[in-house]
């Protein structure tokens, strides 16, 4: 009975997370950049919307903020828009110099994810990437 109770609780949290992502999308002033206050499971939900290009959310392990590319569809590894080529593989000061964002921390070589130390920094990077 305890196992069943735990599974029901997990399902409730999962549906609450889905609702939180839908709410963030609905309330986003810019539908191309969706900011989540927690690291929710967002990929299948936002890939089914037309507008989102990037999602900004906290990294629950490091405290950094993540800028993640939204995929063309939930089963694809193809992003709608990649982060700028000039950011690829850059870290710390090298990334700060190219972005102008003081707390920029990292951009993956494949340009599908980047990080900053603040939500504001991550959103600024997402806006720059959108215009690139």
Sequence positions of predicted segments:
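C-terminal accessory domains and tails appended to enzymatic cores
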Residues: 1-132
